[in-house]
Amino acid sequence: MPLFKLTGQGKQIDDAMRSFAEKVFASEVKDEGGRHEISPFDVDEICPISLREMQAHIFHMENLSMSMDGRRKRRFQGRKTVNLSIPQSETSSTKLSHIEEFISSSPTYESVPDFQRVQITGDYASGVTVEDFEVVCKGLYRALCIREKYMQKSFQRFPKTPSKYLRNIDGEALVAIESFYPVFTPPPKKGEDPFRREDLPANLGYHLKMKGGVIYIYPDEAAASRDEPKPYPYPNLDDFLDDMNFLLALIAQGPVKTYTHRRLKFLSSKFQVHQMLNEMDELKELKNNPHRDFYNCRKVDTHIHAAACMNQKHLLRFIKKSYHIDADRVVYSTKEKNLTLKELFAQLNMHPYDLTVDSLDVHAGRQTFQRFDKFNDKYNPVGASELRDLYLKTDNYINGEYFATIIKEVGADLVDAKYQHAEPRLSIYGRSPDEWSKLSSWFVGNRIYCPNMTWMIQVPRIYDVFRSKNFLPHFGKMLENIFLPVFEATINPQTHPDLSVFLKHITGFDSVDDESKHSGHMFSSKSPKPEEWTMENNPSYTYYAYYMYANIMVLNCLRKERGMNTFLFRPHCGEAGALTHLMTAFMIADNISHGLNLKKSPVLQYLFFLAQIPIAMSPLSNNSLFLEYAKNPFLDFLQKGLMISLSTDDPMQFHFTKEPLMEEYAIAAQVFKLSTCDMCEVARNSVLQCGISHEEKAKFLGNNYLEEGPVGNDIRRTNVAQIRMAYRYETWCYELNLIAEGLKSTE
């Protein structure tokens, strides 16, 4: 596995660096001395470094450089212009025409109409000195190497283009990265049963043992007693903490903040100029594209919770329908007796006929803004937990039959719409080891299959609740309950047939809860191991994320070996809370949901752009909970070129129509004045981001969708203009090339 060679000096984080990282963390989460270290600005017009400090810093550095050997400065003479070298893919028909006097060359593509490019000449150090520019480039280069390492170890996605630049910087040949891609279950063939069990693999006979919060795999029990695990790439906590401390220090460095802030401003301004020059040409491309428009290009709801995947009217209609059909059916059990549906409503002093969407009270309103606790109460129809247990739970007296029926109806609506897909989340809490068997029995028993749905597992971060009630002895037990059954079903599928079939339909894991809840714990080498975490306090976000990633990494290696589908780590991140959440996600998450707090860190925002980390944004959800719609950074991120998609989060709480995803697109298009090309680009991003199979993506996006840039875009399927794809790709390569040029100057 081609991991990356960092110098000894770069690899070892000295005591001063670790101390600085801890100080930065303390100022971020405890508000010590303000929050300016990591979070330099909230409004993008404010420069992260004050003008006086920056002028003094540059003056000092220039004076310092004058007294040094002038060879380095001479190397920069004549380097005022940069020639953009776009790495060529094997299937690309791109040819580059070299233009000496311009920063970026103008590539010509066979499938891209001529369009007007923005070209800028002059110095490109973006407000920092030559010496600082070299430091910035080294830091950004190492940050990208860190992400690439963790993505490849866990069979998650890292784009080809940055890999090519990183290998060019290393002076190494690019290894085909397709072998590191995740594997998703292809759709069943016509007439094939999606719940078939005949092809389950045989038992491997491996032995499993959790050690330090991570499940280790042994060939047999004898090897386990000798502590000789199979040679999988197990996680190294010390390396992770060193990388984390490096990133903490990087995002707090003044020159890095200034450079990235100015590059982001440039990206935003450049896109606006591009739109002024080429908007009509993009529209002309779309008008000449037959049988394809925004309505019939594929779009995926990349972030939606199964328990709220229906709108409030749908839920109300189902409650009334179930009462009409099953009034005398026993549906609920209390300690005293079993209740029919009629008796249950009588006990609640209500009649379904009298219910309205207002009395159902599941919609988020003004009262939920900045009140996540009140938002969670909205999952209880009419404020009654009994109705939530009956209609929105998988484990109840009727074995989740009503919930399964609602989900099937939502799936049927998606099939009718044809071009909309969803990735609902089902919950595993880690309270007991039999949760997986119950959930898989519910899924397979009710035959919950929809060609327009793929599934994910969400793990709520509520260890503190379980520990306070003495359900769990320590955090390690929670991790064991979450992951051990999945390992066992992977090793011996025939003894866990339902779970093995269920796992074929799962594409990833999510980590969910209120991010604004303060932990106060900094994950470090001094942190207790999961087996030693017996206190009632909840571990930090980073602690949760690392141990989820670590187990997913080992699990993916095992499943890849067996020819099974693998899983992505796709947590909620950046909706609220500290910026360390986003820093952790940059290291180990395939993609994230929300990402609002990226607007507070230019360094992380720029890194998310360089690595093209997908972000599922939900402006309507944010509008009810954390951020007013007009202040949502969605448009800003789109203009800069971050890979964003639109999602609904919880249609039951936030939406009104039968097609909540179209409602999300419609409102965003009106508020942000999006063009058709903008919306189709976001829709294409959602398909790339999601966990549907390679075969389906090739059908929806084109056979070359794995290629980046216009070569990988089939306008006949995506309705995204080739001019837009060429602009995005050239701009991305230009920013990566700046880093490469900055590192060349240090040689």
Swiss-Prot record:
Catalytic reaction list: AMP + H2O + H(+) = IMP + NH4(+)
Pathway: Purine metabolism; IMP biosynthesis via salvage pathway; IMP from AMP: step 1/1
Biological process terms in GO annotation: AMP metabolic process; GMP salvage; IMP biosynthetic process; IMP salvage; response to ATP
Subunit and interaction comment: Homotetramer.
Function: AMP deaminase plays a critical role in energy metabolism.
PROSITE patterns linked: A_DEAMINASE
Binding site for Zn(2+): H303, H305, H572, D649
Organism (species): Rattus norvegicus (Rat)
Cofactor names: Zn(2+)
Family per similarity comment: Belongs to the metallo-dependent hydrolases superfamily. Adenosine and AMP deaminases family.
Chain residues that bind substrate: H305, K374, F375, N376, D377, K378, Y379, E575, D650, P651, M652, Q653
Catalytic residues of the enzyme: H594
Name of this chain's protein: AMP deaminase 1
Effect on the protein of changing R425H: Loss of AMP deaminase activity
Record keyword Protease present: no
PANTHER family: AMP DEAMINASE, AMP DEAMINASE 1
Modified sites of kind Phosphoserine: S85, S441
Listed Pfam families: AMP_deaminase
EC number: 3.5.4.6
Domain of life assignment: Eukaryota
Cellular-component GO terms for this entry: cytosol
Modified residues (Phosphothreonine): T81
GO molecular function, one term: AMP deaminase activity
Phosphotyrosine sites (modified residues): Y216
CDD domains registered for this protein in UniProt: AMPD
Keyword Phosphoprotein assigned: yes
